[in-house]
Every structure is written in C-alpha cells, then in structure tokens.
C-alpha cells in the first residue's frame, strides 16, 4: 500500500491534504530535541546570571567569592556549550526545512552562517577548553570544582 508523500505513517486523515510537519515522527523528535537543548541552556544561563549577581552584590564576602569562583569555572563551559549547540541546532533546523533551508527565502542559511562563527569568537572553544583544564580546574588545588560537584549531586 502506497502512502501519499507528505502524509505521516500514523496519519488518520483520508483526504488528499498533507499532514502538518510536526506529525512526522522524525521531525517531531528533532524539534523536541532542539527545544529541550534550548530550554536547558536557558536554565543554565539564568543560574550563571544569578551567580554573577551574587558575586557582585552579596553582603557576605565568602558567598560572594564562592559565586565568583563558579562564574569563573562555568563561563568557558557555557560559552562552548552554547556555541556548539547553537551550530548543531541551526544545522538541524536547516535539515528540517529540507532544500528550502539552503535558500535565502527562509533565513535559516543566514542563521547557520551567523551561528557557525560563534565557536571562534572570544577565543576558540578548544583554546577555552585548554584554559579550563590547565588553569581553572586546578585553581585553588581543585577546591572550586570539588565544591561545584558536591552541590550538583
């Protein structure tokens, strides 16, 4: 039995119209994956912003220093994660749009180009990773990362 192109395998409609793109399982999976990554990044960004505020404005110097340590540790991680995932997400969006994703009509190709450069800005992610591993993780004899791991568990 042939199915009409543009109809999902689980389509209930018998008429000739195509289904919405979200009805296709692979597209739905891709969109939900993109959404979950973005929401996770947003939550991490809010947490890091809160730690930045604490590091600048808290009355207690010990708490202020701990927050500053977390910001110092997590900034290169967040930069690398957000820029790498941004490139992946826009690439996936281009895939979802199919051939239209490569045309200027939809704007996805411009977003992809704009996002592809971000891992290079402000120091490439590989240079940031070297700085993280060889300088920030061993800073204060590794106490910062130990503290961070213990609050995360």
Which residues make up each language-model segment?
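Flavin-dependent oxidoreductase catalytic core characteristic
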Residues: 1-153
């Amino acid at each position: 039995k042939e199915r009409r192109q543009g109809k999902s395998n689980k389509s209930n409609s018998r008429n000739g119209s195509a289904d919405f793109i979200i009805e296709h399982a692979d597209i739905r999976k891709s969109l939900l994956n993109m959404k979950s990554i973005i929401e996770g990044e947003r939550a991490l960004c809010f947490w890091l912003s809160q730690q930045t505020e604490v590091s600048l404005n808290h009355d207690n110097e010990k708490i202020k220093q701990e927050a500053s340590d977390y910001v110092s540790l997590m900034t290169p991680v967040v930069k690398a994660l957000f820029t790498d995932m941004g490139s992946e997400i826009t690439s996936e969006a281009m895939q979802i749009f199919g051939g239209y994703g490569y045309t200027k009509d939809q704007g996805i190709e411009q977003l992809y180009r704009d996002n592809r450069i971000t891992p290079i800005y402000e120091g490439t992610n590989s240079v940031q990773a070297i700085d993280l591993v060889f300088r920030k993780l061993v800073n204060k004899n590794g106490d910062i990362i130990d503290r961070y791991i213990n609050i995360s568990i």
